UniProtKB/Swiss-Prot annotation:
GO biological processes: regulation of DNA-templated transcription
GO cellular component terms, semicolon-separated: cytosol
Record lineage: Bacteria, Bacillati, Actinomycetota, Actinomycetes, Micrococcales
Mitochondrion found in the keyword field: no
Molecular-function GO term, any one: DNA binding
PANTHER family linked to this entry: TRANSCRIPTIONAL REGULATORY PROTEIN YEBC-RELATED, TRANSLATIONAL ACTIVATOR OF CYTOCHROME C OXIDASE 1
Family the entry assigns: Belongs to the TACO1 family.
Domain of life: Bacteria
UniProt xrefs under Pfam families: TACO1_YebC_N, Transcrip_reg
Protein name as catalogued: Probable transcriptional regulatory protein Lxx10750
Cellular compartments annotated: Cytoplasm
Length: 252
């Protein structure tokens, strides 16, 4: 259950990306709007909305912004929320596969921005289905390190709720579940009094690619360029960092 998870290391620069607060806030608000539109404004009956709100609060999105997003999404303000999810596939430097998740009200703009970011940063677009098979949909819960919360405590809390793996990432624990077990595992953590930062359904690579430090830098630059687009919600990759490459990047 526990131990090193290769795919987890690919997210070591996530904190740097999330530091772009304005972009991050806008994307978190969009998630709340969509969750409220699909499941309604009542948090007690909409677990997806609960997780979207939790993630926004942990990223310091103001409560007023969150409340307005819920009302907009649920249609309580008279505004129209019409986002479409689009998945793009491609390859980055070093043969790293990319799955690019967009949430947009303008498909043409999203396609153009993704293609431009890929072309300018060493990436190439791929045919639908040619990359996606390298990923499985999984539930991913991030639990911050805290007093009295160690890997065993997290494991005990989520084991009966369908958790597959608990990994210590240094500053947090990551819980991996089937996507269908995400809410159950998150609820089990809450019942055990363990706080969590985020609980999301994500695409996790089943096949990984190791590169040298230079190629890894190029991949991260490509991810940065893609996530600069307001329409790009998430970028998933098959990149796996060896301990040596990880150390080189951390020293920069």
């Amino acid at each position: 259950m526990s131990g090193h998870s290769k795919w987890a290391t690919t997210k070591h620069k996530k904190a740097v990306i999330d530091a772009r607060r304005a972009k991050s806030f806008a994307k978190l608000i969009k998630n709340i709007e969509v969750a409220a539109k699909i499941g309604g404004a009542d948090l007690s009956g909409n677990p997806t909305l609960v997780d979207a709100v939790q993630k926004a609060k942990k990223t310091s999105v103001p409560n007023d912004n969150i409340d307005r997003a819920i009302k907009r999404g649920a249609g309580l303000t008279g505004e129209s929320i019409d986002y479409t999810t689009i998945m793009y596939e491609g390859y980055g430097p070093g043969g790293v596969a990319l799955l690019i998740e967009c949430l947009t009200e303008n498909k043409n703009r999203a396609a153009a921005e993704v293609r431009t970011a890929m072309t300018r940063n060493g990436g190439t677009m791929a045919d639908p289905g040619s990359v996606a098979y390298n990923f499985h949909r999984k539930g991913v819960i991030v639990v911050p390190h805290a007093d009295g919360v160690d890997e065993d405590a997290v494991l005990v809390a989520v084991l009966e709720a369908g958790a597959e793996e608990v990994t210590d990432l240094g500053e947090s624990f990551e819980v991996l579940t089937e996507a269908t077990d995400l809410v159950a595992a998150r609820t089990a953590l809450q019942a055990a009094g363990i706080d969590y930062d985020s609980a999301d359904a994500e695409f996790v690579a089943t096949v990984t690619v190791q590169t040298d430090a230079e190629a890894a830098r190029k991949v991260f630059r490509l991810i940065d360029a893609l996530e600069d687009s307001d329409d790009v919600q998430n970028v998933y990759t098959t990149l796996d960092l060896s301990a040596e490459v990880q150390a080189q990047l951390d020293d920069e």
